[in-house]
Amino acid sequence: MTYFYRMAGLNVLKLMNDTTATALAYGIYKQDLPEPDKPSRNVVFVDCGHTGTQVAAASFNKGKLTMLASGYCNSGGRNFDEEMCKHFAEEFSQRFKMNVFENKKATLKLLTECVKLKKLMAANTNRLPINIECFMDDKDVSGHMDRAKFEELIAGHLADIEKVMVDVMTASKLKNEEIYR
């Protein structure tokens, strides 16, 4: 990677990953960090992105950042969207006798609506509707989902994320009560 920077005429001193940059920004802007002679403030950063989840544990004192552990898994928001898509595609296949995944336009419409539904569920535990007009062959389709069903669909991905969190906690040798809240 540094080779390409040198080709561009840039002198790169060091590269850092996303979570280290996040921790560094936290340490720079936090004014209430403990003095160097006091016990460190331990913070865990979790970034659940579109394609994966990153977790990092760091300890802070004024002017000092120590990265304790970091981890990554390939479970993110995209996986959640795909699980919802599969669920509704199966439901629409049974109810309306259509194969959603044979039609790219219909698949994209369904995925777009699933993303919207996921965002609504972040703030709502009630049963929420999904309605798509002129979905396939000019048919309107509808369904619904609540957060409990959503969590059931993504349970495997949540387990992957939990495993990364546990692995980071184990590697950092931190206990839950030692983490700053």
Where do the language-model regions lie?
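Oxyanion-binding/catalytic loops of NTP- or PPi-dependent enzymes
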Residues: 1-181
